[in-house]
Amino acid sequence: MILYGAPLSPFVRKVAAFAAEKGLELEKVAVGLGDPNPDFLACSPFRKMPGFSDGDFKISDSSAIVTYLDAKYPEPALIPADPADRARVVWFDEFADTIVTAAGGKIFFDRA
């Protein structure tokens, strides 16, 4: 399995942390948004980070990737089966991807 993206990207780091919690090894290939890497573009034609490849399966978006990994490698389960608990996990994931990342970006990157 190959994870493409910028090492400092919170979305790349989310997938890497998720895989580590599951005990999975990912090959990491560093790419930037303007990188013409054809393997990255095959996973992410719109250059959305991270890109992910597992054999012939290719996809981008950190939430889609962790959902795939949890379904393919169910133990340990990191996304609950219970509908209410699953909904809470999806909510926290979306909250982290939008609100927390936006606030964190200002803290780390908008420094004068």
Residue ranges and their predicted role:
Residues M1-A112:
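GST-like domain detector, emphasizing the conserved glutathione-binding G-site
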